[in-house]
């Protein structure tokens, strides 16, 4: 029996910008709202920067800080008017991650829902990939 072949054609497209279909990091509406609120009080800053540091009982921990500019090797995520910069060292650890902001009666914090994490410590502040 003869096998069928599907024909494929490739066309060059000019004047079209290719955009990634998925950002390294996505933000929930509550994270966007909180970042906007925080930046309102920091007019000299243009966004927040996410980094990763070696610490804790599982090895790595995320850091968040205000930033006045994009670093040379930072990846920029823009969502709903909010700019988040990802340090080079953190870029691979954040692929596919959702950044959320959670507030309850006792605490409020940014939470990184990361599908790549293999393990976390009991308090949830450090992780390994």
From Swiss-Prot:
The keyword Zinc does not apply. Its main location: mitochondrion. Residues 1-12 form a transit peptide. Pfam families: Fe-S_biosyn. It comes from the Eukaryota. GO terms for molecular function: 2 iron, 2 sulfur cluster binding; metal ion binding. GO terms for biological process: iron-sulfur cluster assembly. Belongs to the HesB/IscA family. This is Iron-sulfur cluster assembly 1 homolog, mitochondrial. It comes from Gallus gallus.
């Amino acid at each position: 029996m003869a096998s069928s072949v599907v024909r494929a054609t490739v066309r060059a497209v000019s004047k079209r910008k290719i955009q990634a279909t998925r950002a390294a990091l996505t933000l929930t509406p509550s994270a966007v709202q909180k970042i906007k609120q925080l930046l309102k009080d920091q007019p000299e800053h243009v966004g927040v920067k996410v980094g990763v540091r070696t610490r804790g009982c599982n090895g790595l921990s995320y850091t968040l800080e205000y930033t006045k500019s994009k670093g040379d090797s930072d990846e920029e995520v823009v969502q709903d008017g909010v700019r988040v910069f990802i340090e080079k060292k953190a870029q691979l650890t954040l692929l596919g991650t959702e950044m959320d902001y959670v507030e309850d009666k006792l605490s409020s914090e940014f939470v990184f829902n990361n599908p790549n994490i293999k393990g976390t410590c009991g308090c949830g502040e450090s992780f390994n990939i």
